[in-house]
Structure formats: C-alpha cells, structure tokens
Swiss-Prot record:
Subcellular localization(s) per the UniProt record: Virion membrane; Host Golgi apparatus, Host trans-Golgi network; Host endoplasmic reticulum membrane
UniProt-listed SMART domains: PLDc (SM00155)
GO cellular component: host cell endoplasmic reticulum membrane; host cell Golgi apparatus; membrane; viral envelope; viral membrane; virion membrane
Catalysed reactions, semicolon-separated: a 1,2-diacyl-sn-glycero-3-phosphocholine + H2O = a 1,2-diacyl-sn-glycero-3-phosphate + choline + H(+)
Name of this chain's protein: Envelope phospholipase OPG057
Residue positions bearing lipid (S-palmitoyl cysteine): 185-186
Cited function: Major envelope protein that plays a role in the biogenesis of the viral double membrane and in egress of virus from the host cell. Produces the wrapped form of virus that is required for cell-to-cell spread. Acts as a lipase with broad specificity including phospholipase C, phospholipase A, and triacylglycerol lipase activities.
Keyword terms: Host endoplasmic reticulum, Host Golgi apparatus, Host membrane, Host-virus interaction, Hydrolase, Late protein, Lipoprotein, Membrane, Palmitate, Viral budding, Viral budding via the host ESCRT complexes, Viral envelope protein, Viral release from host cell, Virion
Length: 372
C-alpha cells in the first residue's frame, strides 16, 4: 500500500454473518466461515485470535477452521489464541490436537477477579482483521446467528493488533507486576484511530476503563453519547439489555444505557425498535428489562420484539448515520468489568448495509411481538 494513497471509504470493511440453517432467510454477506477461512489462507506470518473460550470442534465447520489453523501452524505461521482463564475448558484437547498453536490464558482483572476477556477478534500479518460477536467456537461459525466485520485494510488491522497486544499482556501465567509492566509498555501506543480521528469513517472503542491506554475511547461513553444525541431513530438488536452490575453474587443498579433509551423515547420522541434474544444464555433480568421498556414507553414510539432462534448479534444503529457492532451485551457487568473491542462506523454504505440486516431480522418470521 502506498504511504500517501487515499483512505478507502469504510476502511475496506465488509459485514460478516453466521446464520443457522433453520432460518427462513439467507445472507448476502460473507459468512463467518468464509471470513476465517480467508484470513487463514492468506496468512504469511501470523494469526492472532482473541476469544472468551475456544471450542471450534463442536461443529463440522468449526472443526474445518481449526484443521486449517493446524495446517497453517505446521507450515511455520505463528498462531496465538488468547482465551479467558475461565473459558479454557477445552484447552487440553485442543493442545493435544495441535501442539504448534500457542494457547495463552489471560486474566484481565487479577486484583478483583471479576473481569473477563469478552472480545472476539482475529488479526493477521497487520493486514487483515475480523471483529464482531463470533467467538472461536463451532456454534459461532455455524449454528448461532452472529454479526461482525472483516477488513483487509492494513492500517485498521494494525490498530486492532494493538488491542491484542494489550490483552496478551495479561497472561494469567505471569505475576501481577509483570502484567502491569507489559500493559504499561503497550498502552501508550494503544490506538491510532478513535471517534475524533476515524479512518474511512471507522474506529474501535474499548472496555473496561482500566485498559484504555492513550487516546482510546471508552465504549460505554460512545454508546451513551450516541443514544443521548439521537434525533430520529434508534435500532437495537442485542441478546440482552441488563441495567445491573453483578459483583460477588450481588446485583447493583446500572441504569446508564437503560435510561438513555427511555430518555430518547419519552423526552425527544425518537423512534426506537428493540429486538432482543430469548435463549438459555440470557440474563434473568433481560426479559424483565425488555418488558419494562415496553411498559414505560407505551405512549411513545418504542417497539420491542423477541428473536426466537439463537441470536448473538449485537448491533446498534442511530439515526441511520452510525453503526456499532460489539461482543458485549448492553449489560452493566459487561461494561464495568469485561474486556472487549467494538466496531464503530459513520460510513454511509456500512451503516446502510447494517440497517438492511436489522430490517430483515425485524420483519422475519423469527421475530415475535413481546406481547404475544
């Protein structure tokens, strides 16, 4: 890439989806399987993966991706997979299956032991990257609805790799003081692009606050700012909205995102559509929160639907001008404690494509009224 070449619109980002085979529609976008396969096929030096857990062998397509990684590692490509300390259940089996892949467990909060690595992203050769809500599991690759973004624009990939370096510094095998030293080294160069300096209309946001580093944007700040500035419409497709934070088994009220949604509907007359998931991974407060939003805003233009098939898509669109794709629920525990990276864009084409996905999901036979 020439150093003074113009930045392509949308930083060459393409939307990526996993759609279960039992859905009544298909995607026009790259599949997660195709995305991961392309990253592996084109890799020449390294592939770095961050995921809460690693269970690719649970489906046939997941196993195919893992076999491709194994082949790449045997050819000398450096492969590192970051897992959360509490997501390593299948680690022994995977290590025995492929000893050339370096699996590293991380603990981003050794002091309080409440934070998890929640981020889902891949980076290869500082040239290609994926970020979204597909973890490195067979389900995310094949049987659970997910949404992410793939780019082969090197500056964006390099910026995401800096996040990988940050999470890697919290290797759970290291002593705490080594974690702090490693983090201190990588945080000052933590990002090149942010809300005030997007590249091609694209930037990343981060969580939690203690991992921000120099010039990174806190994800919750950006999300709440966008909700509070919404003028016409807010479309949300999420597994859950939970206005609480859990610490040591106790729940504490965390209304920041919840209140911003209510204020937009009641105070400013913003049209809001909320599509929530309804499956066994839901927080106990999730459906109660959805019903409370529906009840509080009964005199306003707020609609709530439930998606009946396993849906881990986490998507926010504001005023048809901004799109946010993340791996975190709108959940106080996630935003206060967990480590993740979110994708943000104001590029018109990317926002339009994300909007079409939301519209498709909203009117599909899998979306049911909350009142039914």
């Amino acid at each position: 890439m020439w150093p003074f070449a113009p930045v392509p619109a949308g930083a060459k980002c393409r939307l990526v989806e996993t759609l279960p085979e039992n859905m009544d529609f298909r995607s026009d976008h790259l599949t997660t399987f195709e995305c991961f396969n392309e990253i592996i096929t084109l890799a020449k030096k390294y592939i770095y993966i961050a995921s809460f857990c690693c269970n690719p062998l649970s489906t046939t397509r997941g196993a195919l991706i893992f076999d491709k990684l194994k082949e790449a590692s045997e050819k000398g490509i450096k492969i590192i997979v970051l897992l959360d300390e509490r997501g390593k259940r299948n680690l022994g089996e995977l290590q025995s299956h492929c000893p050339d892949i370096n699996f590293i467990t991380v603990n981003i909060d050794k002091k309080n032991n409440v934070g998890l690595l929640l981020g889902c992203f891949w980076v290869s050769d500082d040239e290609r990257c994926y970020v979204g809500n597909a973890s490195f599991t067979g389900g995310s690759i094949h049987t659970i609805k997910t949404l992410g973004v793939y780019s082969d624009y090197p500056p964006l990939a390099t910026d995401l790799r800096r996040r990988f370096d940050t999470f890697k510094a919290f290797n759970s095998a290291k002593n705490s003081w080594l974690n702090l030293c490693s983090a201190a080294c990588c945080l000052p160069v933590s990002t090149a692009y942010h809300i005030k300096n997007p590249i091609g209309g694209v930037f990343f946001t981060d969580s939690p606050e203690h991992l921000l580093g120099y010039s990174r944007d806190l994800d919750t700040d950006v999300v709440i700012d966008k909700l509070k500035s919404a003028k016409t419409s807010i479309d949300i497709e999420h597994l859950a909205i939970v206005p609480t934070t859990r610490v040591d088994g106790n729940s504490y009220y965390w209304p920041d995102i919840y209140n911003s949604i209510i204020e937009a509907a009641i105070n400013r007359g913003v049209k809001i559509r909320l599509l929530v998931g309804n499956w066994d991974k839901n927080d106990v407060y999730s459906m109660a929160t959805a019903r409370s939003l529906d009840a509080l805003c009964v005199q306003n233009d707020l609609s709530v639907k439930v998606f009946t098939i396993q849906n881990n898509t986490k998507l926010l669109i504001v005023d048809d001008e901004y799109v946010h794709i993340t791996s975190a629920n709108f959940d106080g525990t996630h935003y206060q404690n967990h480590g993740f990276v979110s994708f943000n864009s104001i590029d018109k084409q990317l926002v339009s494509e994300a909007k079409k996905i939301f519209e498709r999901d909203w009117v599909s036979s899998h979306s049911k009224s909350l009142k039914i």
